Amino acid sequence: RVIPNQNPIQTLTLQHGNNTNEATLAWTNSGTKTGANFILQELLASAWTTGGELFVGRGLFKFDLSAIPANATIISARLSLYSTPNPLNGNQVDANFGTNNSMFIERVVSNWNTTLNWPNQPLGDIATQISIPHTNQSTFDLIDVDVTGLTTSMVTGNNYGFKIRLQNEVFYNLRNFCSSKHANTAKRPKLVISYQ
């Protein structure tokens, strides 16, 4: 007699549309722009200029993990971010640009909401950050990045989401990804989690 697996591996695919837990942070060295944009079609990890001053962009986004039982074991978690085909920032041609656009994906370690701005932005966990190397390709999607450790911490602890930022925020460098507001639903941020 074959005994069925009482605890089979399950897969959850999350690709939210119009995610309210998502924002691009902006900072300029004059302090004139230090807020967060919650409706932008892009998630930025960038260092550029605007009006002759330095502009730095960072992205924050959170997936709803409530469907995963708190006592579940995370087998794997893969994050995909897709380069925007129609950039609204940077040189408005290349989604990836610069001589050093290497970036970090980090687990956010404190809560944030619509009062978010640059001065009160939550920190990312640098001890577990994931390093993404530089690319010379104008369009380069990040497919199935292993975020198992980060996601496990979100399920077993607090889920404050992910942060993306350049490793060196020096202009002109850019990584520009589609947000959950992008018209192409297939290019919105995606997280695929296997658990049991």
Residue ranges and their predicted role:
Residues 86-158:
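Beta-strand-rich interaction/scaffold domains
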Residues 63, 73-87, 191:
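A short beta-strand element within beta-rich, extracytoplasmic domains
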Residues 70-75, 152-160:
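Short glycine/proline/serine/threonine-rich loop/turn segments at secondary-structure transition edges
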Residues 56-58, 68-79:
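Extended extracellular/luminal ectodomain segments enriched in beta-structured repeat modules
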Residues 1-65, 169-170, 181-196:
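Flexible, small-residue-rich N-terminal segments that precede or flank a structured functional core
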Residues 164-179:
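Short beta-strand-plus-loop segments that form exposed binding edges in beta-rich domains
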Residues 80, 157-167:
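Short, surface-exposed ligand- or partner-binding patches at beta-edge/loop junctions that are enriched
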